[in-house]
């Protein structure tokens, strides 16, 4: 397989937060970039363009427990405070810009709570059925360690960030590298049906979401707790990029016990 440098991969992220309304978050970022926010109906989002013309969205997410500060006390808030920041497609050289956006919304009043998660997308355009097979096998072998290191909540693991399905992994691992195709891989991932056209297909709720490969063209890691610490945001993204890069060069690992 071809070798890819970590910094040659495109990425994006979704960071869930509360403490700030979607409108106020867009206003703060627009002020930073010198642009005006605008509203779109999709997910009741407020959007703003950066100096490169890329769109940053602040969308509603029903999984977020909405809160805000009142006289220094955290209180319940209405749905306006359900705020998910959706970055545009970024190059590694734009990591600093992302970190400035994170700092900006934090300084404007945003914070995270236990209901908030962070997702990282990595461009899948160079991935192959063999590299995706590597992805599932590596995740299966290392998930317990990864979840412990990232302090993944049991609730998140049970609902939105499940571990690899052993039966699906075994079926894919039995496919010879010489004959495996993306179509065969896709059928195995969806357990016989093609769910790639369904936005909320049930297979998206895994720590490594390969539904995103077939629906969006990205590998998605959903195993991160949300953070507005710019350094931790960078670390989470770099980890996902490093794993993605490893998939191109690793021989298919053995399916060992966790």
Segments the model singles out, each with a brief description of its role:
Residues 32-37, 105-112, 142-144, 242-247:
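A common structural junction motif
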Residues 248-258:
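Single conserved hydrophobic/aromatic residue that forms the stacking wall/gate
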Residues 202-205, 215-247:
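Beta-strand-rich recognition/accessory modules
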Residues 1-108:
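Terminal catalytic/cofactor-binding subdomain
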Residues 111-127, 218-222:
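Histidine-centered divalent-metal-coordination microenvironment in nucleic-acid enzymes
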Residues 73-78, 109-114, 210-215:
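Short glycine/proline-enriched loop/turn "hinge" motifs that connect secondary-structure elements
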Residues 57-59, 68, 133-223:
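Aromatic/basic-lined ligand-recognition segments
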Residues 31, 94-101, 125-150, 228-244:
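Helical (often loop-to-helix) elements that flank the catalytic cores of nucleotide-handling enzymes
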């Amino acid at each position: 397989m071809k070798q890819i440098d970590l910094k040659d991969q495109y990425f994006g992220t979704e960071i869930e937060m509360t403490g700030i309304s979607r409108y106020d978050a867009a206003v703060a970022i627009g002020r930073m970039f010198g642009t005006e926010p605008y509203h779109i109906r999709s997910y009741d989002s407020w959007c703003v363009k950066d100096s490169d013309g890329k769109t940053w969205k602040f969308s509603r997410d029903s999984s977020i427990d909405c809160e805000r500060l009142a006289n220094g006390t955290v209180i319940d808030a209405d749905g306006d405070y359900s705020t998910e920041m959706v970055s545009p497609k970024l190059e590694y050289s734009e990591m600093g810009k992302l970190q400035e956006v994170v700092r900006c919304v934090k300084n404007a009043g945003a914070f995270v709570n236990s209901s908030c998660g962070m997702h990282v997308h990595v461009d899948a355009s160079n991935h192959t059925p063999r590299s995706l097979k590597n992805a599932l096998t590596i995740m299966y072998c290392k998930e317990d360690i990864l979840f412990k290191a990232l302090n993944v909540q049991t609730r998140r693991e049970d609902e939105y960030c499940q571990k690899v399905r052993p039966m699906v992994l075994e079926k894919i691992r039995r496919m010879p590298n010489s004959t495996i195709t993306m179509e065969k891989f896709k059928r195995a991932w969806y357990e016989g049906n093609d769910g790639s056209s369904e936005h909320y297909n049930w297979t998206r709720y895994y720590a490594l979401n390969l539904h995103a490969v077939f629906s969006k063209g990205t590998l998605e890691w959903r195993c991160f707790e949300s953070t507005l610490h710019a350094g931790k945001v960078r670390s989470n993204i770099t980890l996902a990029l490093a794993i993605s890069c490893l998939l191109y060069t690793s021989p298919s690992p053995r399916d060992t016990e966790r």
